[in-house]
C-alpha cells in the first residue's frame, strides 16, 4: 500500500544509514481510523513551491507527517531551521542523522519572506538538534523570531525547540526573543527514554519547560507525547502531573506511526475512545488545552489552538477576578 510517507519521500536521498545495522521490525497494519488523503491539491503544490523557492526545510516533509496534505492545502507549514541533518538518532524519528552543515545566515530572512508570502497569521518554527553548536542554535532561533517580527508584526510565533542539553544560557536567549508559544516535546514516558529517546533526559526536559515560565510567565508553554510505544496508561497520567507541576499550559497526544522497518515498532494502536479519555483527564488536571487524537501532532491546527489558548487564559483570569 502506498502511504503519505512514500509520496513525501519519493526520490529523496537514502535515509537513516545510522539505523542500517538495526534489525527490521514488523510494521503493523494501520486501523481504519488512521487514514489520510494523499497530498495532491493545488494548495499543496503552491506551498511546496514557496518552500522550495526560499530554500527552506519543513518538518512536515522531513518527519513524514501524515497531515502534510491537509496542512499544505491550507498553506500551513512548520519550518525546520538549522538544516535537515540532526545530531541525534532517536528511534522514532524520520529526520536524518549525521554531521550537520554550517548555519545559513540567510535563513532567518528566507523564513520571514516565506511567512509573508504564505500570509500566515500563526507560524511554527522547529529545528533539528544541533549538539555541535556551542549554544545549540539558540541565537539562530532568536534571529528567526526577530526576522518574522520585522516582516509580519501581526503574525504570532510558536517554536518547537530541542532540549539545549548542557548548553548553559541558551534557553534564556530564546525566551528573550519572546515567542508567543514555547513548545518542547517530552515525546514519551520516562521508562521508554533509553529505547526511544536515548540522547535526552526526561527531567531535564521538564525543568526546561518550567524554566520558561519562570523567565517569562506570559509565554504559553506546550509539550507533546506519542502513544503506542509500549507505555502504560498510569505512566501517561503521571507524565501529565509532571507537566502540570511545571505549569505547562497545553498538551498534545498522538499515535506513534513507524516511519520504516528500522525504526521503533508500533506496539499497539490506541483507540479514538482512549484518546478522548486522555483529553478529558488532562483538562481535569488543569491544562488550558489538550489535543488528543490518533493524528494529533505538535503543529497540527496550531493557529486555531493558539486562539483557543488565549481564550482559555482570558477566561481563567476573568474567573479569578
Swiss-Prot record:
It catalyses: [[Fe-S] cluster scaffold protein carrying a second [4Fe-4S](2+) cluster] + N(6)-octanoyl-L-lysyl-[protein] + 2 oxidized [2Fe-2S]-[ferredoxin] + 2 S-adenosyl-L-methionine + 4 H(+) = [[Fe-S] cluster scaffold protein] + N(6)-[(R)-dihydrolipoyl]-L-lysyl-[protein] + 4 Fe(3+) + 2 hydrogen sulfide + 2 5'-deoxyadenosine + 2 L-methionine + 2 reduced [2Fe-2S]-[ferredoxin]. [4Fe-4S] cluster 2 binds at residues 86, 90, 93. [4Fe-4S] cluster 1 binds at residues 60, 65, 71, 299. PROSITE patterns: RADICAL_SAM. It is found in: Cytoplasm. CDD domains: Radical_SAM (cd01335). Keywords: 4Fe-4S, Cytoplasm, Iron, Iron-sulfur, Metal-binding, S-adenosyl-L-methionine, Transferase. Binds 2 [4Fe-4S] clusters per subunit. One cluster is coordinated with 3 cysteines and an exchangeable S-adenosyl-L-methionine. Its EC number is 2.8.1.8. One of its GO terms (molecular function) is 4 iron, 4 sulfur cluster binding. Its main location: cytoplasm. Its cofactor is [4Fe-4S] cluster. InterPro entries: Aldolase_TIM, Elp3/MiaA/NifB-like_rSAM, LIAS_N, Lipoyl_synth, rSAM. It is an enzyme of class 2 (transferase). It holds the Pfam family Radical_SAM. Signal peptide: none annotated. PANTHER family: LIPOYL SYNTHASE, LIPOYL SYNTHASE, MITOCHONDRIAL. Belongs to the radical SAM superfamily. Lipoyl synthase family. HAMAP family: Lipoyl_synth. This is Lipoyl synthase. It comes from Brucella anthropi (strain ATCC 49188 / DSM 6882 / CCUG 24695 / JCM 21032 / LMG 3331 / NBRC 15819 / NCTC 12168 / Alc 37) (Ochrobactrum anthropi). The gene is lipA.
Amino acid at each position: 500500500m502506498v502511504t503519505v510517507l512514500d509520496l513525501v519521500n519519493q526520490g529523496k536521498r537514502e535515509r537513516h544509514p545510522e539505523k542500517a545495522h538495526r534489525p527490521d521490525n514488523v510494521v503493523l497494519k494501520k486501523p481504519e481510523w488512521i487514514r489520510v488523503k494523499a497530498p495532491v491539491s493545488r494548495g499543496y503544490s503552491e506551498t511546496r513551491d514557496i518552500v522550495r523557492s526560499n530554500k527552506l526545510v519543513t518538518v512536515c516533509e522531513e518527519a513524514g507527517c501524515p497531515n502534510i496534505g491537509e496542512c499544505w492545502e491550507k498553506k500551513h507549514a512548520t519550518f525546520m531551521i538549522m538544516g535537515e541533518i540532526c545530531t541525534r538518532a532517536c528511534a522514532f524519528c524520520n529526520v536524518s542523522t549525521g554531521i550537520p552543515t554550517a548555519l545559513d545566515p540567510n535563513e532567518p530572512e528566507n523564513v520571514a519572506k516565506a511567512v509573508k508570502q504564505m500570509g500566515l497569521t500563526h507560524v511554527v518554527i522547529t529545528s533539528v538538534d544541533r549538539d555541535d553548536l556551542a549554544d545549540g542554535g539558540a541565537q539562530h532561533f532568536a534571529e528567526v523570531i526577530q526576522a518574522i517580527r520585522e516582516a509580519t508584526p501581526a503574525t504570532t510565533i510558536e517554536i518547537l525547540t530541542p532540549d539545549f542539553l548542557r548548553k548553559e544560557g541558551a534557553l534564556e536567549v530564546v525566551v528573550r526573543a519572546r515567542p508567543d508559544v514555547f513548545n518542547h516535546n517530552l515525546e514519551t514516558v520516562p521508562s521508554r527514554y533509553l529505547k526511544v529517546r536515548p540522547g535526552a533526559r526526561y527531567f531535564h526536559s521538564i525543568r526546561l519547560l518550567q524554566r520558561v515560565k519562570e523567565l517569562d510567565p506570559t509565554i504559553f508553554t506546550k509539550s507533546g507525547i506519542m502513544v503506542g510505544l509500549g507505555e502504560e496508561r498510569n505512566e501517561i497520567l503521571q507524565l501529565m502531573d509532571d507537566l502540570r507541576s511545571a505549569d505547562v499550559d497545553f498538551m498534545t497526544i498522538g499515535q506513534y506511526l513507524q516511519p520504516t522497518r528500522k525504526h521503533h515498532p508500533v506496539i499497539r494502536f490506541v483507540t479514538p475512545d482512549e484518546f478522548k479519555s486522555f483529553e478529558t483527564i488532562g483538562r481535569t488536571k488543569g491544562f488550558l488545552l489538550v489535543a488528543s487524537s490518533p493524528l494529533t501532532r505538535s503543529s497540527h491546527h496550531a493557529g486555531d489552538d493558539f486562539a483557543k489558548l488565549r481564550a482559555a487564559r482570558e477566561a481563567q483570569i476573568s474567573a479569578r477576578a
